[in-house]
From Swiss-Prot:
Functional description taken from the UniProt entry: Located at the top of the head of the 30S subunit, it contacts several helices of the 16S rRNA. In the 70S ribosome it contacts the 23S rRNA (bridge B1a) and protein L5 of the 50S subunit (bridge B1b), connecting the 2 subunits; these bridges are implicated in subunit movement. Contacts the tRNAs in the A and P-sites.
UniProt biased composition (Basic residues): 100-126
GO biological process: one example: translation
Complex formation: Part of the 30S ribosomal subunit. Forms a loose heterodimer with protein S19. Forms two bridges to the 50S subunit in the 70S ribosome.
Pfam families, alphabetized: Ribosomal_S13
GO CC annotation terms, alphabetical: cytosol; small ribosomal subunit
Gene3D superfamilies tied to this protein: 1.10.8.50, 30s ribosomal protein s13, domain 2
Region Disordered: start-end pairs: 92-126
InterPro entries: Rbsml_uS13_C, Ribosomal_uS13, Ribosomal_uS13-like_H2TH, Ribosomal_uS13_bac-type, Ribosomal_uS13_CS
GO molecular function: rRNA binding; structural constituent of ribosome; tRNA binding
Gene assigned in the entry: rpsM
Record family assignment: Belongs to the universal ribosomal protein uS13 family.
The protein's name: Small ribosomal subunit protein uS13
Keywords, sorted A to Z: Ribonucleoprotein, Ribosomal protein, RNA-binding, rRNA-binding, tRNA-binding
Length: 126
């Protein structure tokens, strides 16, 4: 099993797909890395040589991935919250940040529905 950037890549996947298991590397970046290193995208990870793995390792180190990327994102959000801008306040309140409506929808960001006590029904007329 190849270990790149602290992530064990699945042995039976193609290299192109296996690299996307690293946080911060999607399909497009994976294709760029493979073109840069000259590794065939269709080979399986178990078939890679040690030279291929070390080439991939050095190519991935050029990007911010995994813990560094997560830390950078959290620092950016914390900076927005510290300066007290609109986006920072929305992050702090757990609401959508990019201008989406919240009267309806936005359930992912706001969490599950809360039940609110409704008013009592009027007594039935006789």
């Amino acid at each position: 099993m190849a270990r790149i950037a602290g992530v064990d890549l699945p042995r039976d996947k193609r290299v192109e797909i296996g690299l996307t298991y690293i946080y911060g590397i999607g399909l497009t970046r994976s294709q760029h890395i493979l073109a840069e290193t000259g590794v065939n995208p269709d080979t399986r990870i178990r078939e890679l040589t040690d030279a291929d793995i070390s080439a991939l390792r050095t190519a991935v180190e050029a990007y911010q991935v995994e813990g560094d990327l997560r830390r950078l994102e959290n620092m950016n959000i914390k900076r927005l919250q510290d300066i007290g801008c609109y986006r920072g306040r929305r992050h702090r309140m757990g609401l959508p940040v990019r201008g989406q409506r919240t009267r309806t929808n936005a359930r992912t960001r706001r969490g599950g529905r809360r039940t609110v006590a409704g008013k009592k029904k009027a007594p039935a007329k006789k």
